[in-house]
From Swiss-Prot:
UniProt feature, compositional bias: Polar residues: 579-596, 779-800
Entry's family note: Belongs to the ubiquitin-conjugating enzyme family.
Identification of the protein by name: Probable ubiquitin-conjugating enzyme E2 23
Function recorded in the entry: Accepts the ubiquitin from the E1 complex and catalyzes its covalent attachment to other proteins.
Source species of the chain: Arabidopsis thaliana
Feature: compositional bias, Acidic residues: 59-88
């Protein structure tokens, strides 16, 4: 899990191991042969009792140990090159930290080389080492979770999942004197610095997320001198010794930490609070850490007036920012440094006895230099009381050498010139007075404490609708990638579109999940009555049990515990207090018993003011907050001003999610009309915005409802259209602007190893280019060369060479698919690709001779070497276009399906790979094949890869692409195609998700079949009809087998069951419910094309 606050450790951890409560071991879940251990787990060594944090688990490619270690080393080297002293320091550090007693490398960054074996983990121990450990040699004593995390029971990892709704952590703290403070709630802890990277902050009407923080560090030297290093760079002011846990970029410094400057210039340019700079003074103790400068990524604005239309500067003074700190207590972990205000600790650092600044000087020059600097200190001290411009040595008070220091000096009315010893005494009095004041203030400071142990308990909302409170975190495991159909209680959902895919305007019901049966994959949903306007009270229809495969997450109402939200409508209809419209909201506000009472004791639960009366005052910070409760379709929000209120789903909007790259109204003019304004990175902090943007909000009121929603409201009913209605409702009543930044995130996909799949394609011999047809026929290939957009046709034989010609077999020699009596050619030339996706691409541009030769070669390879189950059509008048269909292989959830792809060969082909488009019909049935037609494959350079996984202009071909799609994409377990999911292979979570993915994939495969029979792509009408006529019987036979519970993808080519015993009852009830709805439609469609369906009449009556 992501941990925002991994503070650096210290070497002052003597006796830490003995401080760990041995009873914690009894709570461990590590009793099995291969315990569940995850990155960031807190573990205890069974032999030594040491406590540490897991930094890497075998197979965890996203572990911290993989993060740019080389880049960090490069940064260190650059810094060292700038300073010889730092170079020497680095050499000493490398010599001291080569190997520890166990033969393991010290934690200096060089240990992170070499992959871990299957039963190994890497642990950061409190004794400054990070050795590789056997997974069975440690015991998990704590596990961290955040609000909104998905979890499962460690004893039943394939059972129901839950969502963390509250976190309570108690910690043991190591004090500087070696004492241990046990069982301290993290709610009582204070950060060593108020702001951290990743925090959300508010500045006026703007909400932002902190990207970077530069510290102001106050350093106390051993001789009592003190300075403040402004906007310090961690590479120039380094901890001594090196941190015992991973370096934390968020909190590199803490009070009580020893630091050393990389060069004397670090302190020379600092602000001196006491004493003077000396070039040989490089080490000191940190007494205070504050944020000096904060860099903020501005996300959203919800306000009125000019301040809300232009984002503030990226760099901000901390005093201008308000921290949104609802859940900071959940971010503590072993190794963090903290302050404990309730302890009232005042630790005094033993210092060397002060050396008088007024010692006798060896020369008059030294004396004058010293006097001048001391006078600067004096001037700072008295600047608020005396005119600073007139302060000179002569203007200081008259005091005899026998006078004791006192605080009632008088200023001489006229200059008096006196001998040096008396002059010296005058200066001494003020300087000593100042030193005493600073010493009294700074010598005693609150030192940080180290978190050496933690115990986490969480409240979990389970899929079955129950809420379990204060469960021990080590009895749960994190679910990092919940399946697409792992819905949870109180989640908003909508019905999927109809099976035929034709009626895009068909209303879809929206509802709230009350509970989910994880085993059966069914959900109990309370459907919402359609609403015409957002301000109407929500009413529920009947509660219905449906298959989870019939549902998908609500596209607009996607809320989770812990989400940061802003109020969409700070003003609403001003309803009378007695209006029935208020009773619904007030009733929901009174029923909050499911929340943690402790965390809400000091907060005042209010009836949402903005729900009842207009208001434009954002100074109370009641427009931004965190979701702390979900119940009966309503959302409880703890606002930044500390108040709590319950709002409807239309009233707030989630911000800050990484995948949040579209406005609520979509990428259409609707978005602009609703006064959602995209904030591009290039515009960030700009002093002005274009006039057309400024004029958007003023034109909103003139837009009618029809104008606003006409373009982008298909497929929505009243319940689904609530967010659009809410925005329109807001803009009718106010001219405010809700702006937010857009962050583009590429869709993730999977990488493929194509080495084995390519063997067949690479073995193709293209040396038959000189073969030609004896009988020139109209089907011979014509190519376009040096033509305008309309193009003139020329025979390929004349263009390429007299030796090279087209390579189609004689039409009297068709090559049908093996095992089928269908006469449909595997490769053929067609005319007029009218429905081709790339038809609009200009294919008549001038092409080089090499292009034609490569296309000629590719066509010949396809004509001679296409494997079973792949059919291709080229086009006589558009040689740059191809269309292919792949038949789904048996033993996969794609069995007997047809999958169509369009290809375009650009003018610089083969230097670049072809472009591809998948005819999805609107369904996502593979991680690499997107609804919008994107094909994600390393061979097409749409995903990363190495070696022969990527396109090679010299050896790659269209055939390789097709074989990759057939064998690597449309495989038996497509779930693991998703990027990073390969590490889940063999795990309970992975196999559970894979089974569910296969069930949904087969259902989508059936829908795709019906779609293709209704709308066959051009030039493949004959193939589609003949394929489903011949395979229809086996398709229905597979449906019948799966309805009986046999495992998806376990059937032979003739849809027979391989093992009658092992596969029974493998499919879920939810899958059977959904298939029972699809089967009758599929039966009818197959009957219409002439398939033999009589044996499966019972499917039509499901």
């Amino acid at each position: 899990m992501e941990h925002e606050q991994d503070d650096p450790g210290t070497s002052t951890n003597v006796g830490v191991d003995s401080s760990v409560d041995d009873s914690m071991a009894s709570l461990s879940i590590c009793d099995s042969e291969h315990p569940n251990i995850y990155r960031q787990d807190i573990v205890k060594n069974k032999k030594t009792g040491s406590v540490g944090v897991v930094s890497e688990v075998a197979g965890d490619s996203d572990s911290d140990s993989d993060i740019s270690d080389e880049e960090e080393d490069d940064d260190d080297d650059e810094d060292n090159d700038d300073d010889d002293e730092d170079v020497e320091e680095g050499k000493k550090a490398s010599e001291e930290n080569v190997v520890n007693g166990d033969g393991e490398k010290k934690a200096d960054g060089n240990y992170k080389c070499g992959a871990l074996e299957g039963d190994q983990i890497r642990v950061l121990w409190m004794d400054n080492t990070e050795p590789v450990q056997d997974i069975n040699d440690v015991t998990v004593i704590d596990r961290g979770f955040l609000h909104g995390d998905y979890v499962a029971s460690a004893s039943e990892p394939t059972g129901q999942v839950g969502v963390v709704v509250d976190v309570n952590i108690s910690v043991d703290l190591l004090a500087p004197d070696g004492s241990i403070h046990k069982d301290i709630s993290t709610k009582n802890l204070k950060r060593v610095r108020d702001f951290a990277v990743g925090d959300y902050v508010v500045h006026g009407p703007w909400l932002g997320r902190i990207d970077d923080v530069l510290d102001n560090v106050t350093v106390l030297f051993d001789d009592g001198s003190m300075c403040k290093v402004l906007r310090v760079e961690p590479l120039r002011l380094k901890p001594i010794p090196k941190n015992n846990l991973e370096e934390d970029a968020n909190f590199p410094y803490y009070p009580g930490q020893r630091v050393k400057a990389s060069s004397s210039s670090v302190f020379k340019n600092s602000r001196w609070l006491s004493g003077l700079w000396k070039p040989n003074r490089l080490e000191g103790t940190v007494t205070k850490v504050t944020a000096g400068s904060i860099f903020v990524y501005w996300i959203a604005s919800a306000g009125f007036g000019p301040d809300s239309s232009v984002s503030p500067p990226e760099e901000q003074n901390p005093s201008n920012l308000t921290l949104l700190s609802c859940f900071t207590h959940a971010n503590w972990q072993v190794g963090d440094w903290c302050l404990l205000p309730s302890l009232n600790q005042s630790a005094t650092i033993p210092l060397h006895k002060h050396v008088s600044k007024l010692r006798l000087y060896d020369s008059q020059a030294d004396r004058q230099q010293k006097i001048g600097r001391d006078l600067e200190d004096v001037q700072d001290e008295v600047s608020g009381k005396v005119e600073p411009a007139g302060i000179t040595a002569e203007a200081l008070p008259k005091v005899t050498s026998d006078d004791p220091p006192q605080r009632n000096p008088s200023v001489s009315k006229e200059p008096v010139h006196e001998p040096w010893p008396l002059h010296r005494k005058k200066i001494r009095k003020l300087v000593i007075r100042k030193d005493k004041k600073v010493k009294k203030k700074e010598e005693s400071f609150e030192q940080a404490l180290l978190v050496v142990n933690s115990r986490t308990r969480v409240d979990v909302s389970w899929q079955d609708g129950t809420i379990e409170c204060r469960r021990e975190a080590i009895t749960l495991i994190p679910i990092e990638t919940p399946g697409d159909h792992e819905f949870v209680s109180e989640q908003y959902v909508v019905e999927k579109t109809s099976d035929d895919g034709d009626n895009t305007t068909e209303p879809r019901r929206a509802g709230v999940v009350k509970n989910v049966n994880a085993k059966d994959r069914t959900a109990s949903v309370r459907w919402l009555n359609p609403l015409r306007r957002a301000e109407e009270p929500r009413e529920f229809e009947k509660e219905e049990i449906v298959s989870v495969y019939e549902l998908e997450g609500h596209p607009d109402y996607d809320y989770c515990y812990g989400d940061v939200v802003v109020r969409l409508s700070p003003i609403a209809v001003a309803l009378p207090a007695s209006s029935p419209g208020n009773s619904f909201e007030e009733a929901t506000q009174q029923d909050n018993g499911y929340q943690d009472s402790e965390s809400h004791q000091e907060a005042k639960i209010l009836v949402d003011k903005e729900e009842n009366e207009p208001s434009t005052d954002l100074s109370k910070l009641s427009w931004v907050g965190n979701i702390t409760g979900l119940k009966d379709g309503d959302i409880e929000v703890t606002w930044a001003d500390g108040t709590i209120s319950t709002v409807g789903p239309h009233a707030v909007y989630v911000v800050g999610r990484d995948d949040d790259d579209e406005s609520v109204a979509g990428e259409s003019e609707t978005s602009d009309a609703a006064s959602w304004e995209t904030l591009n990175d290039d515009d960030r902090g700009a002093p002005e915005i274009p006039e057309e943007d400024l004029g958007r909000s003023s034109s909103i009121e003139g837009n009618s409802d029809a104008d606003i929603y006409a373009e982008n409201d298909s497929g929505r009913n009243g319940a689904l259209a609530l967010p659009l209605a809410a925005i329109e409702f807001v803009t009718r009543l106010a001219s405010g602007i809700f702006s937010r930044a857009r962050k583009s995130v590429d869709s993730s996909s999977s990488d493929y190893t194509v080495e084995n799949v390519y063997k067949q394609a690479e073995s193709t011999n293209p040396s038959d280019e000189t073969d030609s047809l004896d009988d020139p026929s109209p089907s011979k290939v014509n190519v376009t060369d040096n033509c305008e957009s309309k193009g003139t046709q020329a025979n390929a034989k004349n263009i390429l060479s007299g030796e090279t010609s087209t390579f189609l077999e004689d039409e009297d020699k068709p090559v049908p698919s093996e095992g089928d009596s269908c006469s449909f050619r595997r490769f053929d030339i067609s005319q007029d690709p009218l429905d081709h996706h790339f038809l609009g691409v200009d294919g008549q541009k001038t092409k080089e001779r090499q292009w034609f030769k490569k296309v000629d070669q590719d066509w010949k390879i396809l004509q001679n070497n296409l494997p079973d189950g792949i059919f291709v059509r080229a086009y006589e008048d558009r040689m740059d276009l191809l269309r292919a269909v792949i038949v789904g292989a048996f033993g996969t959830p794609y069995q007997d399906g047809l999958f169509f792809f369009d290809f375009h060969l650009p003018s610089d082909y083969p230097s670049v790979p072809p472009s591809a488009y998948y005819h999805s019909g609107g369904w996502r049935l593979n991680p690499n094949l997107y609804e919008e037609g994107k094909v994600c494959l390393s061979l097409l350079n749409t995903w990363t890869g190495r070696g022969n996984e990527v396109w090679d202009p010299k050896s790659s071909s269209i055939l390789q692409v097709l074989v990759s799609l057939q064998g690597l994409v449309l495989n038996s377990k497509p779930y693991f195609n998703e990027a990073g999911y390969d590490k889940q292979v063999g795990t309970a979570e992975g196999e559970k998700n894979s089974l569910g993915y296969n069930e949904n994939t087969f259902l989508l495969n059936c829908k795709t079949m019906m779609y293709l029979m209704r709308k066959p792509p051009k030039d493949f009408e004959e193939l589609i009809k003949d394929h489903f006529r011949k395979r229809g019987y086996y398709i229905l036979k597979a449906c019948d087998a799966y309805m009986k519970g046999y495992l998806i993808g376990s059937l032979t080519k003739d849809a027979s069951v391989i093992d009658e015993r092992s596969s029974a009852n493998s499919t879920s009830v939810g899958f059977k419910l959904m298939l029972a709805k699809i089967a009758p439609k599929l039966f009818s469609a197959l009957s219409e094309v002439g398939a033999d369906c009589n044996e499966f009449q019972h499917l039509q009556q499901q």
